[in-house]
């Protein structure tokens, strides 16, 4: 059975989480889902990182086809993305659980 690797970058504000995500995305060639792709692209450029694809929240939930192979992605701010998806369906996120396993 193949082990599924999921990166979780958990740290305080202003600690470099997003820059670490940029480096992972660049190295792996995996796009990043984010609220504002243009702002994120400019932020990556300011760190000297280019060649990353960014996908908006809206594009992430509407693009693709169920028959397509699942595409690997990173998500910047998973809480915000979850909130966005739930709000689209008239739900309001009030809490969640997360495992601290590697």
Per-range role (PLM):
Residues 4-65:
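Conserved P-loop
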Residues 50-94:
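Conserved RecA-like ASCE ATPase "motif II neighborhood" in helicase/translocase motors
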Residues 94-102:
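Ser/Thr/Gly-rich flexible loops in soluble cytosolic domains mediating phosphotransfer, phosphorylation
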């Amino acid at each position: 059975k193949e082990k599924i690797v999921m990166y979780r970058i958990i740290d305080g504000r202003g600690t470099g989480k997003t820059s670490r995500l940029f480096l992972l995305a660049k190295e792996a060639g995996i796009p990043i889902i984010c609220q504002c792709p243009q702002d994120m692209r400019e932020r990556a450029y300011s760190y000297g990182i280019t060649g990353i694809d960014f996908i908006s929240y809206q594009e992430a939930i509407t693009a693709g086809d169920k028959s397509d192979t699942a595409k690997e992605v990173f998500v910047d701010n998973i809480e915000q993305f979850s909130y966005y998806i739930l709000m689209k369906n008239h739900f309001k996120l009030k809490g969640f659980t997360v495992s601290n396993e590697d």
